[in-house]
Amino acid sequence: MTGKLGPDALATALAATGAADPAVAQGPAYGEDAAAIDLSDAGETLVVAADPLSLAAESVGTLAVHVACNDVAASGADPRWLTHTLFLPDDDPDRLRTVAEQVDATAEALGVAVVGGHTEVLDALDRPLCSMTAMGTTDRFVSSGGAEPGDRLLLTKGAAIEATAILATDFREECLEAGVPAATLDAAAGFLDEVSVVPDAAAVRDAATALHDPTEGGVATALVEMAAASGAAFAVERDAVPVRPETRACCDALGVDPLATFGSGALLAAVPPDRVDDALGALDAAGIEGAEIGVVEAAESDGDAGSAEGDAEPGTVRIDGEALAEPPRDELYPLWEARE
């Protein structure tokens, strides 16, 4: 079944780390989307992140660049370099040109150089598959796992920014049939221009103890991953999570929970309470919406779960007091699968 591996299955992959290297400051771990390599001689940390993209047929090249660069940005670095592996289902030159032009334009807009890659035809596929590796450097690496009890949880822009653009393009006819006005879909398609969190991260990284960008599984999954990586529990108010009218219209029309679907475009930040105003002010100065959606709580070290504040298992996320049993499967997958 298409989608992310669960934590137990993922542990098998995360354990395969090859040779030990003392320069690795952050290696594979649940909830961490980027690696950090200590470049001591340069006084910097190299941040590396890899991401594949295949299902957003209309904008696969654009989104592939953004999701990889977002992971680097959400680690406190400015993305600078990309390598690009592209698998095509056939040798259609128009398809290749479309993806290549999307990659080129998006990388140029972000100020990122495409420095290498690989391209080939794989006839087992029915759509292009882009896999990007993004790299950048920073003097302060920010992991997903640094959230501390008492920190406030901030979210930029809103839930399901990426999913809204996908619904408005790949599922436009279905949305129209469900009664979504064409003008709403036209506006929603423009959300593709907002899936980068590079400016969001630049605005809040100095104040943040932890950063994480929602992708597959949306804000809900990002919360679980960040809480687990931090060994903490999160308490979130659903009504505090920004959901734009276009997002609500598209998601309601096709029965999708905005908190449980592709969320690129939003950035989740844990910020000490005395830095919340600084972070929100920096976002406002950059022209980016930001909202406080919850709080980081202490978790039980012995793993015993309870209902009172501060005694939940690490990784527990409560939304309006109700604990998520597990990270949700992204709610766009059933829509794609219904077409197969």
Task: Please provide the spans of the model-predicted regions.
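Small-aliphatic-rich amphipathic alpha-helix that forms the alpha element of a beta-alpha
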Residues: A57-L82, V99-V112, P199-A203, T221-E225
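Extreme N-terminal cap/leader segments of soluble proteins
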Residues: M1-A56, T106-A107, G111, E331-E340
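Active-site-proximal betaalpha loop/short-helix elements
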Residues: D91, A188-G263
